[in-house]
Amino acid sequence: MYNVDIKKNIRIKQGRVVSNKMDKSIVVAIERIIKHPIYGKYIKRTTKIHAHDENNACNIGDLIEIKECRPISKTKSWILIRIIEKAIC
């Protein structure tokens, strides 16, 4: 065996927090824009991802950055990296 670190392609995404009611968990809505294959109109599509928030630092409306990690639970395989922008409440 060689002592070489093999890094896989780590995915990083940005999104808004839509729920923080669970302990150490958040739900993040990630928006993307796609072009309709026939009509050519640009459409917004939203994906909701469950992520791990170790310190319960996020609030609803925060813009955050998450990265993919090993599965933490049945639905969580993303972890919070940083809070980009706090929500104005």
Swiss-Prot record:
GO terms for cellular component: cytosolic small ribosomal subunit. GO terms for molecular function: rRNA binding; structural constituent of ribosome. Pfam families: Ribosomal_S17. Keywords: Ribonucleoprotein, Ribosomal protein, RNA-binding, rRNA-binding. PROSITE patterns: RIBOSOMAL_S17. Coiled coil: none annotated. Transmembrane segments: none annotated. One of its GO terms (biological process) is translation. One of the primary rRNA binding proteins, it binds specifically to the 5'-end of 16S ribosomal RNA. Belongs to the universal ribosomal protein uS17 family. Part of the 30S ribosomal subunit. This is Small ribosomal subunit protein uS17. It comes from Baumannia cicadellinicola subsp. Homalodisca coagulata. The gene is rpsQ.
